[in-house]
Amino acid sequence: MTTLAIDIGGTKLAAALIGADGQIRDRRELPTPASQTPEALRDALSALVSPLQAHAQRVAIASTGIIRDGSLLALNPHNLGGLLHFPLVKTLEQLTNLPTIAINDAQAAAWAEFQALDGDITDMVFITVSTGVGGGVVSGCKLLTGPGGLAGHIGHTLADPHGPVCGCGRTGCVEAIASGRGIAAAAQGELAGADAKTIFTRAGQGDEQAQQLIHRSARTLARLIADIKATTDCQCVVVGGSVGLAEGYLALVETYLAQEPAAFHVDLLAAHYRHDAGLLGAALLAQGEKL
């Protein structure tokens, strides 16, 4: 059975056909509409899926935000503008006349990464460090989504009570410090206004401030991982995202994690999948997991 998988992100929309063998075919991509209106998103989704839907038997959506009862929510509702409560599942069912499921994109990616692990692993946590910090938790070979869809939003746990205000409305979240956006926001002087990619480049050239910003991010993530180990007793943590997979970053996280007491140590692995983990994870869940 073929799944039409859709990934809804802040900057792009992607879709592909994924067969029972897990192979991705006919991948398409469009920019996410700049206008945060239901009509604009519906029109963009229609344009995205119309060439593919005749070849699929079901639809699986991986989306940024919180998915609750098939609709789109956010930790900070203001972030969604007019898309708050957008009925993702209902919209795609109307567009395609196919059965549809929806899940948070990081939760979907966690499920894809879990499938790529050694068969002896039953408990893992996936963390994506990119523009933001997200994640997903697999416990006893089951993906945890929670009754309200919030499970795995580990970027919004507390890192520093005196830290910067996070977009979710809390103060001092991991995301506000460790993410690409957080790294860039803390830059000062000649690095002020630089994005995370530029800061990583400057760090590689020996810039002291850039190196300090990256170390701050890695240290914050290591502390989060120690907390995750204490909370879930996971067997491994898989790290992905543009920051998480940046050259040398995971090694830094490992260095800081090694400074924690031994009980909080856990194996760290680089993500197997990159851009298409959300698509693949959503399709895998549609094939065999009830949400």
Swiss-Prot record:
Q: What is one Gene Ontology biological process annotated in the Swiss-Prot or TrEMBL record? A: N-acetylneuraminate catabolic process
User: Which reaction does this chain catalyze?
Assistant: aldehydo-N-acetyl-D-mannosamine + ATP = aldehydo-N-acetyl-D-mannosamine 6-phosphate + ADP + H(+)
Induction data: Negatively regulated by the transcriptional repressor NanR. Induced by N-acetylneuraminate, via inactivation of NanR.
Matching entries from InterPro entries are given as: ATPase_NBD, ManNAc_kinase_bac, ROK, ROK_cs
Gene Ontology molecular function: any one: N-acylmannosamine kinase activity
Superkingdom of source: Bacteria
Metabolic or biological pathway, per its Swiss-Prot or TrEMBL entry: Amino-sugar metabolism; N-acetylneuraminate degradation; D-fructose 6-phosphate from N-acetylneuraminate: step 2/5
EC number(s) on file: 2.7.1.60
Q: What general EC class does the enzyme of this chain belong to?
A: transferase
Q: Pfam family example for this protein? A: ROK
Detail which positions bind Zn(2+). H156, C166, C168, C173
- In the UniProt record, the signal sequence range is none
Q: Which PROSITE patterns match?
A: ROK
Q: Which UniProt keywords apply?
A: ATP-binding, Carbohydrate metabolism, Kinase, Metal-binding, Nucleotide-binding, Transferase, Zinc
Where ATP binds, per the record, is at 5-12, 132-139
Subunit structure, per the record?
Homodimer.
NCBIfam families from the UniProt entry: NactlManKinNanK, PRK05082.1
Q: What does this protein do?
A: Catalyzes the phosphorylation of N-acetylmannosamine (ManNAc) to ManNAc-6-P. Also has low level glucokinase activity in vitro.
Family in the record: Belongs to the ROK (NagC/XylR) family. NanK subfamily.
Q: Could you identify this protein by its name?
A: N-acetylmannosamine kinase
